[in-house]
Amino acid sequence: MAPKGSCKQQSEEDLLLQDFSRNLSAKSSALFFGNAFIVSAIPIWLYWRIWHMDLIQSAVLYSVMTLVSTYLVAFAYKNVKFVLKHKVAQKREDAVSKEVTRKLSEADNRKMSRKEKDERILWKKNEVADYEATTFSIFYNNTLFLVVVIVASFFILKNFNPTVNYILSISASSGLIALLSTGSK
């Protein structure tokens, strides 16, 4: 049986590894899929009102393409977030360290071990990096998706049948951002 100190150290290591893993929490997954669904459903209005594709007759097509696009956009969110999180953490490290050290010196008069201070700084740095990477990932991918949908729909595929235009523009847009998100830079 492992000593209690070993179990505590193992749980701290697990928490640290969890911060740097590609796995998303349930909250992040819900946020990503919720945003991806909304952004993927926006082009329905465009095709219903401008391209005159009937909502009822095209409901199955709209549903299938929205679900496929939702998955690909959420995949892009996750990939971009993972790449950005480490870059943001490195850039924000000094500022977060100063802020946490200042707050600890103001609020805590008791002596805190150096290890505990470092853990709090690391936790705060990861929290800030996670938040900033998440928001930027959503903004970047939403913007790119909607711009590509509009360009594809109105300029590249303008002479196609509206149904084909919808299928190609949505699949190309979501596929492109999913593909671009797999890059490491």
UniProtKB/Swiss-Prot annotation:
The modification Phosphoserine is found at S11, S105. Residues 1-27, 77-135 are lumenal. Residues 49-54, 158-163 are cytoplasmic. It is a multi-pass membrane protein. One of its GO terms (cellular component) is endoplasmic reticulum membrane. TRAP proteins are part of a complex whose function is to bind calcium to the ER membrane and thereby regulate the retention of ER resident proteins. Heterotetramer of TRAP-alpha, TRAP-beta, TRAP-delta and TRAP-gamma. This is Translocon-associated protein subunit gamma. It comes from Pongo abelii (Sumatran orangutan).
